[in-house]
């Protein structure tokens, strides 16, 4: 099944970095809306060691067709992590007017 709209989740080390990513996504019309949730506690493994960090979580509403070729490279270009979290989940259902708005705001 193919999905038209997705939620993209991106973690960032600080609110400032998160805001830079938000501004870029909105300016380039790669996202209709981005929520910043702060702080979030992240526990992860990196190079054989366990870490616990405070981060911010961005929740991006966008079109699925923009993910791989545009959103991922654009976020990687400005993200300070070697391997940033950039994952997408399909929007299975939603208010049709909201979904239409996502489409309109990301149309170029």
Predicted regions and their residues:
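Positively charged, small/polar-rich N-terminal and surface patches that mediate targeting and assembly
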Residues: 1-108
